[in-house]
Every structure is written in C-alpha cells, then in structure tokens.
Amino acid sequence: MTDLAGPTITPNLQLVYVSNVERSTDFYRFIFKKEPVFVTPRYVAFPSSGDALFAIWSGGEEPVAEIPRFSEIGIMLPTGEDVDKLFNEWTKQKSHQIIVIKEPYTDVFGRTFLISDPDGHIIRVCPLD
C-alpha cells in the first residue's frame, strides 16, 4: 500500500520545449486567446486553470536539439459540439497556420481532433471527461 500521509501534490505546470519561443508564443496566444502571464526570451507561461500554468521553454540560452519536441497537449471543451465549432473556427481563419493532423472524429471519450504546433507537438481538442 502506498503511503498517502501528508499534503497532496497537484501537477500545476505543463512545460513543452520549443525551438523558437517568439513564434510559439504567437501561436499559443492565438490558440488560447490569452496573453502570457510571464515572459522572458527563453520561457513564457500562459495561465491555465486555477494555479496551473502552460509554459513553453527553449531549454537554455540556445534551443537544445537533442531534447525531443513531442508532447500531446490537451484542450478540453464542455461538449462535442464545441469541439467541432473550434475546429471550424481554427481551420477557416487565415491569420495563423493550423496544421491538421486528424480532422474531427468520435473516439471512446467523444468528439476529438488533432493539430500540430510549430514544433510538432500534438494538440488534442476533446470534451471534458
């Protein structure tokens, strides 16, 4: 049995490595429709929910090529209908390139689709669990 004594630990930072912080900041500012809450040349953090942050980081003064640039980032919306609406909104606009990996489909957890950020990280949009 695992010892669960003491304070609970809650994950409150999702960090992804990027090769170009400025380009990725612009991309996520568009995707999240939010301004970052913390900005440096190598690290930028966006508010998520509660005290959680979503952050992008170069990995150092120069991007480290050996660090994999692959994560799956989840965006959960209230309903499957909202998933379809957001897909249509993102793919019809012309200001930002949206790379569609998989168009909306229904999986075991409901409607979902996949896009890619500029570094190849997968962004999955799906309904709340």
Curated annotation (Swiss-Prot):
Keywords in alphabetical order: Antibiotic resistance, Chaperone
Pfam families cross-referenced by the UniProt entry: Glyoxalase
Keyword ATP-binding: no
Keyword Transmembrane helix appears in the UniProt entry: no
GO terms classed as biological process: response to antibiotic
Phenotype caused by lack of the gene: Loss of D-alanylgriseoluteic acid resistance.
Coiled coil: none
Residues annotated as domain VOC: 10-128
Function recorded in the entry: Required for resistance to the phenazine antibiotic D-alanylgriseoluteic acid (AGA), an antibiotic produced by E.agglomerans itself, and thus protects the bacterium against phenazine toxicity. Probably binds AGA and acts as a chaperone that works in tandem with a membrane transporter for subsequent antibiotic secretion.
Subunit note: Homodimer.
This protein's name: Phenazine antibiotic resistance protein EhpR
Gene that encodes the chain: ehpR
